[in-house]
Amino acid sequence: MAPVHPSVSRSRCLIVALVSTDSVPSARDRFARLKALAPAIFALSVVLRVASTMGYYLVEGDAFFDLRIYVLGGAALNNPGTLYEFFYTDPLKNEQLPFTYPPFAAILFYPLHLLPFGLTALLWQLALVGAVYATVRLSQRFVGGGSRRIAMLWTAVAIWMEPPGGSIQVGQIGIFLMLAVLYAAYSTRWWVSGLLIGVTAGIKLTPAITGLYFVGVRRWGTALFSAVVFFATVGIGYLLLPDETRRYFPGRMSEAGHDLPVGSVWNQSWRGGLSRIVGHDVGTGALLIGALLVTALISVLAWRALGSVGGARDRLASLLVIQIFGLVASPVAWTHHWVWVVPLMIWLFHGPWRAKPGARLLGCVWFALMVLSVPTLLSSAQSSIHDISQPWYLAWAGLVYIVAAVATLVWMIVAGRRADYPDGSAADGPGLGRPPVTAHRRGTEDAPEQDDPDRGDGQR
């Protein structure tokens, strides 16, 4: 067999289920054929994903419950004072799910109730699939480029992974918010970036942590404008829904996670993980504060490491550090909130540090965790999502995403100490030996793309 091209080795985790390893042609030829079939694979995957989710919804009814809440939240505006009073009851689990978003989000969700719910659900999940593809493409631009066919293959697999697949099944808005935050970090226009972060934070508070990214890269105007836009969304809510806005800020906002099953294995935050280990909700006690302080220190060191190679800063990885910290620090980080793993894997396999020792292994670990849906497997041993106490081995296994996230940050610190690359590829791709796409040039969006992603994933 001909020698395996390095990029094929980097992509093996992605194509292991699609390409036989014992055929006569070289691995590179197999990968080329796979790439040629990318549109068909992508189309088939999307059809199966949409059909399976819609079929589950039609048969069981236990799907799109987050989307149900968005629709009901928008419709509640027709009955003033009911936005934070209603509950959607899950038909299978009999859980009562309230509307937990700011009033501004309900205003944006208002048009959703004007269509039949089945049609809304179909269009919503198609849009989510499109957002996953756009996320992959934008992540490729961060690392220097990449072909549309590779993006199709990534998307075809990603929509079946736990975070994106779970988001599609429940109709979560998180993928849309991730795409908006990614573009905010990619854009060099302060008003575009600030507008996107302010609006997304107005819809769901968690994207507000991205302000730390803009402060860290000294984009002061963007950080300030994002705060102005956020408060503008609060003002819009107050003008249109004064009672609901007064009720949400600061009351319901400060109660985030208070009535939620924080000890469920689906909650992959430090609060959830530590609660399962000790057998009760740790709340905001010393144990949680200690874990967050240690993680914050590790995140700061990882941030510094990402700016230490050649004096340049890896923008995508720096953004990922902030988002990873935000996930583990949140009171509740359901598995479908971890959609940021998709750009993380793209960075590990195709980014400027891809030749660093451990990058491919770490990417494969994340890939395996996402495909195996470890929390889903562990949930089968969970009698109720409200039961916190569980056997020690299940409690420790339930730290899986948290441990992988902290390990990723630690790896960034260790890898950042190496200014050279063991295979001599310091000038082999975008960001290696030169600024890693620190500021994109105008017009590069329309630059011809590399047909062969095996060369630095499309250098510019």
Language-model-derived ranges and their functions:
Residues A2-V4, V8, V16-V19, V437, ...:
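Acidic, Ala/Val/Gly-enriched low-complexity intrinsically disordered segments
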Residues P3-S7, M178, A185, P430, ...:
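Intrinsically disordered, low-complexity polar segments enriched in Ser/Thr/Pro and acidic
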Residues I197-F214, S330-W340:
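Transmembrane helices and adjacent periplasmic/lumenal helix-loop junctions
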Residues L138-S147, S187, I203, W220, ...:
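Hydrophobic/basic alpha-helical segments enriched in Actinobacteria
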Residues I15-S193, V217-T335, I388, Y393-A397, ...:
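Primarily membrane-embedded glycan-assembly and transfer machineries that use lipid-linked glycans
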Residues L301-A302, V339-P352:
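Alpha-helical transmembrane segments in multipass membrane proteins, preferentially the mid-helix core
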